[in-house]
């Protein structure tokens, strides 16, 4: 009891700087022990010895309390080490004694220890500072809300304008893209049309050439005489009319070329001229006239049937597809092949037409007559009554 009072007198009653320093140092530097015992109690007990019995009693109580404390801590599952617990209690005690704060005037950290307590002026200043800070925060919130609202409205307007502009730009870009695509398509179409026109013109040219070739085509039976006639005419003219010395000219080509030029003048040739054969009769030296439309080229004069010496090779400027003379002669000697008739061209006997059953004429069937309509072949005897027979019999008698 005396020890407890002494502790109260040291800690609370006489709160001097020296006593607080002694207690704090004892609490900081003591070793492992319990709250009920330890170095502070031991020093108090040693500092106030009265009698030997009191010392023994206190010592016995100290041991029993330490033993019971140790047992209770082990049963509750607490950690045996009390250094951490004591430090935690000491920090809580200091926190309860006073708060650490900042002085508004000096802007320095104020300790909460008993020697450095916060004054009334600092408390008032701190309160005003908190109020000012709260008002500033509220003002800032209001201003921020107003600015945000204003920006929101303006932002919507600007967004609408931007959207309209973007829509117009998109439409303009889309129109430009469509125009460019149409131009590209038009160019491709024109190119394709040009290609088809070339193909069509080429086909027309080939068709015209084929028609000309078939028009100028002569049967093999008339080629030999015609070629002799053409060679004779070329030799007679001596290229005076501009005709090339080519014996394979067709009748149509010769006719066309000689028809546009005037007839050449008559020329006399000597017998020593190598261009004509000595076997050629003098009647054939007459200048032939250009053939007319009614001339029969298939029947040339007899003097033209005489063969002539071989002529010069054909020139490169004439592109006429007439076979050579040897081929013509070989074809002329061959007998003409019989013409093949197609199945559609063959005349077949007319097939009898099929008639329907309704169209076929059948003999008329005899009509059935009724029994009343049929005329009897021999008249049947009429039956007489008995009264008439009796009367007649009586009369005869």
From Swiss-Prot:
Composition bias, Basic residues: 382-391
Superkingdom of origin organism: Eukaryota
A cellular component term, taken from the record's GO annotations: nucleus
Chain positions covered by the region annotation Disordered: 256-397
Ranges of Low complexity composition bias in the record: 278-287
Major localization listed first in the record, in broad terms: nucleus
Polar residues bias locations: 267-277
Subcellular location: Nucleus
Keywords linked to the UniProt accession: Nucleus
Family of the protein in this entry: Belongs to the NPIP family.
Protein's recorded name: Nuclear pore complex-interacting protein family member B2
Organism: Homo sapiens
């Amino acid at each position: 009891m005396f020890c407890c009072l002494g502790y109260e007198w040291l800690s609370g009653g006489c709160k001097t700087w020296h006593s607080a320093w002694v207690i704090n140092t004892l609490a900081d530097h003591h070793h492992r022990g319990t709250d009920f015992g330890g170095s502070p109690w031991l020093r108090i007990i040693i500092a106030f010895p009265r009698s030997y019995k009191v010392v023994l009693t206190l010592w016995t109580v100290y041991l029993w309390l330490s033993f019971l404390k140790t047992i209770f801590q082990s049963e509750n599952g607490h950690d045996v080490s009390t250094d951490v617990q004591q430090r935690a209690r000491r920090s809580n005690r200091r926190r309860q004694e006073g708060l650490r704060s900042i002085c508004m005037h000096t802007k320095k950290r104020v300790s909460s220890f008993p020697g450095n307590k916060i004054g009334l002026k600092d408390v008032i200043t701190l309160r005003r500072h908190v109020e000012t800070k709260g008002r500033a925060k509220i003002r800032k919130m209001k201003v921020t809300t107003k600015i945000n609202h204003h920006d929101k409205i303006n932002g919507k307007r600007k967004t609408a304008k931007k959207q309209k502009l973007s829509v117009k730009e998109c439409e303009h870009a889309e129109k430009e893209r469509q125009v460019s695509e149409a131009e590209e398509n038009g160019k491709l179409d024109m190119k394709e049309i040009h290609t088809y026109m070339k193909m069509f013109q080429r086909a027309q040219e080939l068709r015209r050439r084929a028609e000309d070739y078939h028009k100028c085509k002569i049967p093999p039976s008339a080629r030999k005489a015609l070629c002799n006639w053409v060679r004779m005419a070329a030799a007679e003219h001596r290229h005076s009319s501009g005709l090339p010395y080519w014996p394979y000219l067709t009748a149509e080509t010769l006719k066309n070329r000689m028809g546009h030029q005037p007839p050449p003048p008559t020329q006399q040739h000597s017998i020593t001229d190598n261009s004509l054969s000595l076997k050629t009769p003098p009647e054939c030296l007459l200048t032939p006239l250009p053939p007319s439309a009614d001339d029969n080229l298939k029947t040339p004069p007899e003097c033209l049937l005489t063969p002539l010496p071989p002529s010069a090779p054909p020139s490169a400027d004439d592109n006429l597809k007439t076979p050579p003379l040897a081929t013509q002669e070989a074809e002329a000697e061959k007998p003409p092949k019989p013409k093949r008739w197609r199945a559609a061209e063959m005349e077949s006997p007319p097939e009898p037409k099929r008639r329907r059953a309704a169209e076929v004429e059948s003999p008329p069937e005899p009509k059935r007559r009724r029994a009343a309509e049929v005329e009897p072949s021999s008249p049947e005897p009429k039956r007489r009554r008995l009264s008439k027979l009796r009367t007649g019999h009586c009369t005869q008698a």
